[in-house]
Amino acid sequence: MSLLTLKNRRERGFFDGQFLIAMPGMEDRNFARTVIYICAHSDAGAMGFVINRPQSLTFTDVLLHLDMIKQEDSIVLPKRAREFPIQTGGPVESGRGFVLHSDDYSSDSSIPVSDDICLTATLDIVRAISKGDGPTRATMLLGYSSWAAGQLESEVVNNGWLTCPANEELIFDRSLDDKYERALAGMGVTAAMLSAEAGHA
């Protein structure tokens, strides 16, 4: 599923607004120990973002790459901009940036993905954040995760993923190292429990 499909969708799918939490046996290195926020799901497929993978680039690096600032300007960026988090959202279009954010910021290109969360993928929001403005809560993700028609359903049925309602606090929490464990804890399980169950299946 693409961003265009997300923008043109009319109905929410079953996995919309859900977390996918990778089972301990996930072999795909792109998704091992990941928590994914599903933004769109329909008969055409699904699209979402990994929310617990760090990215080596900083927001300053992004601004420099986009020629929005010069190197000497980086030291005068607002503190909020200097510390703005960048994460790896998935293996599809990994050079493209997307901003998941609270709905207190909106532009013509912003796409509502839930009652409280929007997705914007244009330079307007990058400029706003660079000035210390923009949404109250946000994170930039490079790349996204995508599934073809029926693919996600098949992976869930085959015990590739656990699913649960998404938690906004966890989406925007900047502590990534233990986010996987906290997502599991929210379901009342641990990775060790799941590994033991798989071993006795």
UniProtKB/Swiss-Prot annotation:
Name residues in a coiled coil: none
Question: What InterPro entries does the annotation carry?
Answer: AlgH-like (IPR003774)
**Single GO cellular component term:** cytosol
Q: Which Gene3D superfamilies match?
A: VC0467-like
Task: Report the sequence similarity comment from the record.
Answer: Belongs to the UPF0301 (AlgH) family.
PANTHER family for the chain: UNCHARACTERIZED PROTEIN YQGE, UPF0301 PROTEIN YQGE
Q: What name does UniProt use for this protein?
A: UPF0301 protein RL1035
Taxonomic lineage? Bacteria, Pseudomonadati, Pseudomonadota, Alphaproteobacteria, Hyphomicrobiales
